Design a protein with these regions (language model features):
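Conserved non-cysteine loop/helix-boundary elements of the Radical SAM core domain that shape
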Residues: 181-380
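Key residue(s) within conserved catalytic/signature motifs
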Residues: 143-144, 176, 255
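Canonical Radical SAM [4Fe-4S] cluster-binding loop centered on the CxxxCxxC motif
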Residues: 159-195
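N-terminal [4Fe-4S]-dependent radical SAM core
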Residues: 91-95, 115-163
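Radical SAM enzyme core and accessory elements
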Residues: 1-108, 112-116, 120, 198, ...
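Amphipathic, soluble alpha/beta structural segments
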Residues: 214-215, 219-223, 401-407, 470-489
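A structural motif corresponding to the C-terminal lobe/cap of the Radical SAM core domain
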Residues: 304-317, 326-459
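Short beta-strand motif preference
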Residues: 50-52, 165, 279-281
Length: 489
């Protein structure tokens, strides 16, 4: 299946709406050959036209050109995208649960519309009628927006910020992963020089934040796999963080403990000793077969043992990640994993939907309708979380997620992950340290924003570290109301 769009400036919306039904279909720049499977969308001088052809059968639809936007109409691109969406919904029998929405932050839309003075009825119509969003998905987004409001008010106070520290090393690469990470065995010689530079960057961030008069709100050490560092390296890094910042003044300090094959009792004790208030242990699944399919080098029992060690070390706010749609998993298998996670009684359970990234090892062709039903049925099992006392507190979506579904963080009341909310709703400055780090500066209630990028790969980050420090000086400059220029590596 190919996508061909003509007559529009970009066709971005049409392209991504087609991928709600055919996730991996490529966009072509030339008309499809006669008889070839395709979705063809076209803005003609006198009308809008769309066709789907598959397996020797085809269907076409057309509509008048929309009236101009300034007269209350739609843009030609949105009108053509809607026409194509209706065609493919009828052709495939699939109703995407988020309807025509291709954006990754539906909860942010609720916040934005409320801030703009829209009534609740107008917001309802926007989601349910204009975008054909299902009542269930919209209801979840709206409930999450309600829960987030007091947290966002605190996090969006002037000159508050969160600190992200990235560890781009893993013991092995999971087949679904597209993040830049280095194999620990192959690149072990980089780890200590990287940690040394990282500590210096944390100190530089402290200095720049102080110059700008910023107040630290939360800390998140992620990856990669932060516990791929040795216990001594964790002490070095977290000791630097403790020396630089008043940890008693922040609302949250998270460390991704991640995988049990590189997390042990000593590292868990270090994480607790140096001030972390929240950790994440991420099984993804409790099926040994599925763990092997995705390239994990540990068993489900190892996850249980790691969780027990974390509790023994005194960790009292634990998140566990699961992924719906992993290779070889089933609805029954996913439900079993979900029940196992609930039985462990962590404070947070985050349910992700598998995302098809070109940089990952998983290569999946167009999803069949039964695949759609399986992944959707997996997420329907999340009612078990609500029944166990968890509630959804943040939600986001990614491009090329199976069947346009979502990732949702569930928590027990009072255990919302603040950093997750702040970064998803984009209300707060995030200062990032480490390879691949993306600092996002926010001021004037979100009216001014600027990004500062670190070099992507650890080797380049280490070799050009002086440039990393020089770029961080842009933080204080930004808050002096001199925007400067966006810099990237």
């Amino acid at each position: 299946m190919n996508i061909y769009i003509t007559g529009l400036g970009s066709g971005y919306e049409v392209e991504h709406l087609v991928r709600l039904f055919y996730p991996m279909a490529p966009l072509t720049l030339t008309p499809p050959e006669d008889g070839a499977d395709c979705v063809w969308a076209e803005k003609r001088p006198d009308k809008l036209w769309a066709m789907v052809r598959q397996g020797g059968k085809s269907r076409t639809v057309e509509a008048p050109l929309p009236i101009p936007v300034e007269e209350g109409g739609e843009t030609p691109e949105f009108a053509l995208a809607s026409l194509t969406y209706d065609l493919l919904r009828s052709w495939t029998g699939i109703r995407p649960p988020w309807g025509k929405m291709t954006g990754v932050r539906p909860v942010r839309l609720v916040h934005d519309k409320r801030a703009a003075g829209w009534t609740e009825e107008e917001i309802d119509d926007f989601f349910l009628k204009r975008f054909d969003c299902s009542p269930e998905k919209y209801g979840m987004a709206k409930a999450i927006a309600d829960l987030q409001e007091p947290i966002l008010k605190m996090g969006s106070a002037p000159k508050t910020y969160s600190l992200y520290i990235g560890i781009p090393f893993c013991p092995s690469r999971c087949s679904y992963c597209s993040f830049v990470s280095c194999n620990l065995d192959r690149d072990r010689k980089l780890v200590q020089p990287y940690v040394d530079c990282l500590c210096r960057e944390v100190e530089a961030i402290r200095d720049e934040a102080d110059k700008a008069g910023l107040m630290l709100c939360s800390i998140y050490i992620g990856g990669g796999t932060p516990t791929s560092l040795s216990a001594a390296q964790l002490r070095q890094l977290m000791g630097t963080v403790r020396d630089c910042f008043d940890l008693s003044a922040i609302v949250e300090y998270t460390v991704e403990a991640g995988r049990p094959d590189c997390t042990d009792a000593e590292k868990l004790a270090v994480i607790r000793e140096y001030g972390a208030t929240r950790i994440s242990i991420n099984p993804q699944t409790f099926s040994d077969e599925v763990l092997e399919n995705i390239g994990r080098k540990h068993s489900a029992q190892d996850i249980l043992d790691c969780y027990a060690e974390a509790r023994a070390a005194g960790h009292d706010d634990i998140n566990m990640d699961l992924i719906a749609g992993l290779p070889g998993d089933t609805v029954e298998g996913f439900e079993k994993s979900l029940r196992q996670a609930i039985a462990l009684d962590p404070e947070n359970i985050t349910v992700h939907t598998l995302t098809l990234k070109r940089a990952s090892r998983i290569v999946i062709e167009d999803q069949k309708e039964n695949d759609y039903a399986d992944v959707a049925a997996m997420l329907e099992k999340c009612h078990l979380l609500a029944e166990a006392g968890y509630r959804p507190y943040y939600l986001y979506r990614q491009k090329n997620t199976l069947q346009n579904l979502e990732n949702v963080g569930w928590c027990k009341p009072g255990h919302e992950g603040y950093y997750n909310i702040y970064i998803m709703e984009e209300v707060q400055t995030i200062l990032s340290a480490g390879a691949g780090g993306s600092t996002k500066l926010v001021a004037d209630g979100g009216k001014r924003m600027q990004r500062i990028f670190n070099f992507k790969y650890p080797t380049e980050y280490i070799q050009r570290f002086d440039e990393v420090l020089e770029r961080k000086k842009g933080v204080a400059v930004f808050y002096d109301h001199d925007l400067g220029t966006e810099t990237s590596g």
